[in-house]
Regions:
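Basic, Lys/Arg-enriched alpha-helical interface segments
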Residues: 1-64, 72-79, 87-95
């Protein structure tokens, strides 16, 4: 999958070195994947949450962090919408 919005991910990695390795691994896995739909995401990431409008919530580093993306499966792209801790995520309203 092609990832758009990497600047959000890169900025977060620079500011939070303790999660950099896990986010690097997630990025590499996503870039090497081709998902045709949410079922492909769930088969690789069973703990991911699939929301309406093709949004996907990924749990990173033992669910301490979250990455929120919007997937365009037919085009093979994902847009990073948000990156943060689980506690910060709980204050957001993703639907």
């Amino acid at each position: 999958m092609k990832i758009f919005g990497l600047i959000k991910l890169d900025e977060y990695k620079r500011a939070h070195a303790n999660v950099r390795g896990a986010l690097d691994q997630w990025q590499l896995e996503v870039e090497r994947s081709h998902w045709s739909g949410p079922q492909d995401v769930k088969s690789r990431y069973p703990s991911a949450s699939i929301l309406s409008d093709n949004k996907v919530i990924f749990n990173i580093k033992g669910n301490k962090y979250r990455v929120v993306v919007k997937a365009k499966y037919e085009k093979g792209i994902v847009f990073i919408e948000w990156v943060g801790t689980h506690a910060e995520y709980s204050k957001q309203n993703f639907q």
